[in-house]
């Protein structure tokens, strides 16, 4: 490879492409848009779900279920991850989980699940515990403290209604 083989590729100050200025310009007459059709017209933009006039997928596939706006969002964490992230005798709180990037995003309640091994004595504060998680925590000598819900269902409904 020689120095004269190297090229800059995309030029920084490429001149604007002038279209529709006669056949000698190379982009005259149809201005690079082909002949007729929707895509040749000005102002046309196809809908993102347009499938060439065929029955679109979102109308072919049956709809199922609904989104329950009153449902709780529950964040689950396993005792195995807590065992890896925390030291012996530490207290596992929502703030501590967020500081160690174990609890992310917005959620209403925290649930501790029993997947993995727990060998350290931990005090774990959460809204819910699975049976296996409670058994593993007590077997390791730790305690499972249940937190009160952030908001009651009635309070959540009132908060969502007031957002409107």
Curated annotation (Swiss-Prot):
InterPro entries: Ribosomal_uL15 (IPR030878), Ribosomal_uL15/eL18 (IPR021131), Ribosomal_uL15/eL18_sf (IPR036227), Ribosomal_uL15_bac-type (IPR005749), Ribosomal_uL15_CS (IPR001196). GO terms for molecular function: rRNA binding; structural constituent of ribosome. The keyword Repeat does not apply. GO terms for biological process: translation. Residues 147-164 have a biased composition (Basic and acidic residues). Keywords: Ribonucleoprotein, Ribosomal protein, RNA-binding, rRNA-binding. Residues 9-20, 32-41 have a biased composition (Basic residues). PROSITE patterns: RIBOSOMAL_L15. It comes from the Bacteria. It holds the Pfam family Ribosomal_L27A. GO terms for cellular component: cytosolic large ribosomal subunit. HAMAP family: Ribosomal_uL15. PANTHER family: 50S RIBOSOMAL PROTEIN L15, LARGE RIBOSOMAL SUBUNIT PROTEIN UL15M. Part of the 50S ribosomal subunit. NCBIfam families: rplO_bact. This is Large ribosomal subunit protein uL15.
């Amino acid at each position: 490879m020689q120095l004269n083989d190297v090229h800059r590729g995309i030029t920084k100050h490429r001149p604007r492409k002038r279209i529709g200025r006669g056949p000698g310009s190379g982009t005259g007459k149809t201005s690079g848009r082909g002949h007729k059709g929707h895509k040749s017209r000005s102002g046309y933009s196809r809908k993102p779900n347009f499938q060439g006039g065929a029955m679109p997928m979102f109308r072919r596939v049956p709809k199922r279920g609904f989104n329950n706006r009153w449902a709780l969002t529950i964040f689950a964490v396993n005792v195995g991850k807590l065992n890896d992230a925390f030291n012996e005798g530490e207290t596992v709180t929502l703030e501590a989980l967020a500081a160690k990037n174990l609890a992310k995003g917005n959620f209403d309640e925290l649930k501790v699940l029993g997947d993995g091994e727990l060998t350290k004595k931990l005090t774990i504060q959460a809204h819910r515990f699975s049976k296996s998680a409670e058994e593993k925590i007590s077997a390791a000598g730790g305690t499972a403290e249940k937190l009160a819900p952030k908001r009651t269902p009635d309070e959540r409904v009132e908060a969502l209604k007031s957002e409107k």
